[in-house]
Structures are given as structure tokens and as C-alpha cells.
Amino acid sequence: MLESLQPESELLHDEPDPGEKVYECDECRKTFSLEQHFVEHKKTHGGEKSPECTGCGEEFSKASSLTRHLRSRSRRESYKCGNCGRTFSQRGNFLSHQKQHAEERPSESKKTPVPMTTIVRNQRNAGNKPYACKECGKAFNGKSYLKEHEKIHTGEKPFECNQCGRAFSQKQYLIKHQNVHSGKKPFKCNECGKAFSQKENLIIHQRIHTGEKPYECKGCGKAFIQKSSLIRHQRSHTGEKPYTCKECGKAFSGKSNLTEHEKIHIGEKPYKCNECGTIFRQKQYLIKHHNIHTGEKPYECNKCGKAFSRITSLIVHVRIHTGDKPYECKVCGKAFCQSSSLTVHMRSHTGEKPYGCNECGKAFSQFSTLALHMRIHTGEKPYQCSECGKAFSQKSHHIRHQRIHIH
């Protein structure tokens, strides 16, 4: 459900992944991202040959045997660093490692690794096409097409968007990207009417309606509608955190997490409430805050009727009824219903206190605790007693005081 809430810009990378396998049916030209799905589809045409692995050519008597073989190959397939010889079983980890060498030698070309199975498949499909890529074996009819393709491997991006400065390896990707700025959304979903600037994003969106999740984690079996979500998820198993803060050295698994963290150091709070003037570091916090003024709570729990201003809050609330606690501490085993609670809890083990007071230097494990502490310096007391007018800096102190009037 959460995946359906992602902004369109996060749904798909604009450029194709040279390491991602695509299987095309000779009968109907339908394409598949996973070979297991491709093998199952071939059965629908009937009279198929013995199932064969496109990577090594081995034939099998049953499709299930081929499926087991493919899983075994996937586990064994590794990426070897040409600079230091280190091998990786996951492509994402390999790419992160390659960045370290790229930073050491920024002038050198940054080539993307290609799995051997992709090279073998491309060579088989070459046919009579005379121009073949030396990196991945893919062949083309024209030399110009080959040159365009090679930019994927070299990292060359000569086509730059004059609106935002983002660069692309091929002109067609720039043209597709420019729809983001123009506001054009020609691709519309027949199910719900939502429109997209790129056809690929529509295809991914439609999986929300069909329930298709072609990208499965080999570690825990969890499936995703897009490859980028799987890559981010796999970091929860590997512990990989490729994005590091230059100020304090803290590492993050996602680039967006690093971007938000960096605002702590620069003190940036660009989002201001027009009603009361409160400022926020993130737009999502401002939107959530706005509901205090409007009182709007459009998302209601089917179990108890409690309403929420955000659908994500409803999803977390429903876990109270289901007992689902998907986020578990690897140190002590304590489980939580939301990831933010686990993040805060982990600091009790690590002793990390990332939120520091600019006035006195005192540090805190939670931003909310820092916000309360800051009122000591500012003198802010937002909670006022309606009976006697006495004001308090904290809500808990206000509630405790009100008991005096009740008794």
C-alpha cells in the first residue's frame, strides 16, 4: 500500500539498467523481467521444447527443475572488482564498492558491471547484427546505435536538462524526462484515472491494481513492484549504507535519508505554516501539521472507527489490531510496529545522540526531546491553563497542573 503513495519521480529510474535481464517471447513478443515467469509463460503456447537455461544452455525435463537451477545460479553469480579483486554476490553492493575506486580516480571512466548471463544471452540474440558491444555483447544494425548504447557503460551523459541540470546518456531519455517539467501526463491508468508523464511509470503503477510483484528478495521472500524498492530493501539484510554524511560521518541506506539528515547540520527549515508560522524541516511534517488547523481526518480504521489525517498513520494504527510488529531489533529482539520506533530504540544500544543543542551543546537521541529542551533557552510556554492562566513549556506539566483545579 505504501508503494502506491510514492511520487511519480520515485517510481522509476529514467535510464535502463544494463545488468537487468529482459526475456522476450518469440511467439507473442511479451517481455518478462524474471526468467522463471518467462518459462511459465512459454507453456501457454504449447509444444515447447525442453526448458533450457539461457545462461549456461543446460536443458531440464521439468520447468520446476529449471526454476531451482536458476535460483542456484542467482545465488552463485558474483561481481568481481577489476581494481582489487574483491567479489560481491549482490550487484548493489558491488556498485557501492566501485564508487570508492571512482572517488580515488575521478578522471577514469565509470563502467557498470554486466553479469555473465546477460553477456551470453546477448551473444545468442546477436543474429546478423554486425556491431556488437564489447562490454555486454549486445549487437546492433548500425554503428550509431552501438555508440549510443556504449554510453550506458562509460557513464557519459552529454544530454543535459536546461530546467534542472540533470544529465542523460541518450537524447530519448532527456525528452522523456522533460515531461516532468512541462506537466504533460499522456499515459493514463484505465483503472483509477491517474496520469503519468512516462509509460514505464504507468506500467509500474498498474501493478498496484493487478497485485503483480515481480521483484522478490531472496533473503526473506518479500516481493516488490519495482526493482529500486527491492534494492533499498536488500540493504536491511546486508547492512549496506552507501550514503555518508560529510559533517558527522553517519551513514544511510538511502540518499533521501541522507538529504533529510543533512538539514540537521545546516539548520534548514524551509517549510512554514501560513496559519501559525511554525516552520518544519520536511514538507511532510508541514502537511501533517496543517491538519491541526483544518481538523481533516479522511482515513478511518475499519476495526474501531478511529480516523487519521494521513494514510500512513492509519496503516501503523491497524497493526495494533493485527499485532503485526515487522521491525525487530537485532540486538535484543524487541519488535516494533513502525521503523521510526526501531531507529530510536537502537540508539539505546549505540548511545547515539544525533540531535545537538546549538545553545549549550547538550545532545539528544530524539528530535522531539531537543525541541522540548530548546524551550528552556527560548522561554516558550505554549501550554496555558484555562483556569488560572499559568503557562508551561511541556504538555505533561500542563496536564499535571490541571489536576490541582479538579481536586
Swiss-Prot record:
- Name the SUPFAM superfamilies for this protein: beta-beta-alpha zinc fingers (SSF57667)
- Which tissues does the record link to its expression? Expressed in both embryonic, fetal and adult heart. Also expressed in lung, skeletal muscle and adrenal glands.
Is Cell inner membrane one of the keywords? no
Up-regulation conditions: Up-regulated by activation of alpha1-adrenergic receptors.
Spell out the residue ranges making up region: Disordered.
1-21
| Taxonomy, superkingdom | Eukaryota
Q: Where is the composition biased (Basic and acidic residues)?
A: 10-21
Q: Which UniProt keywords are listed? A: Activator, Developmental protein, DNA-binding, Metal-binding, Nucleus, Repeat, Transcription, Transcription regulation, Zinc, Zinc-finger
Any Gene Ontology biological process: regulation of transcription by RNA polymerase II
Pfam families the record matches? zf-C2H2, zf-C2H2_6, zf-H2C2_2
Named from the GO MF annotations, one term is:
RNA polymerase II cis-regulatory region sequence-specific DNA binding
Zn fingers (C2H2-type): where? 23-45, 51-73, 79-101, 131-153, 159-181, 187-209, 215-237, 243-265, 271-293, 299-321, 327-349, 355-377, 383-405
Subcellular locations according to the entry? Nucleus
Gene Ontology CC, one term: nucleus
Subunit note:
Binds DNA. Interacts with GATA4.
Q: Which family does it belong to?
A: Belongs to the krueppel C2H2-type zinc-finger protein family.
Main function = Transcription factor that acts as a cardiac regulator and an effector of alpha1-adrenergic signaling. Binds to PE response elements (PERE) present in the promoter of genes such as ANF/NPPA and acts as a direct transcriptional activator of NPPA. Also acts as a cofactor with GATA4, a key cardiac regulator.
Q: Which PANTHER family does its entry note?
A: ZINC FINGER AND SCAN DOMAIN-CONTAINING, ZINC FINGER PROTEIN ZFP2
Q: What is this protein's record name?
A: Zinc finger protein 260
Source species = Rattus norvegicus
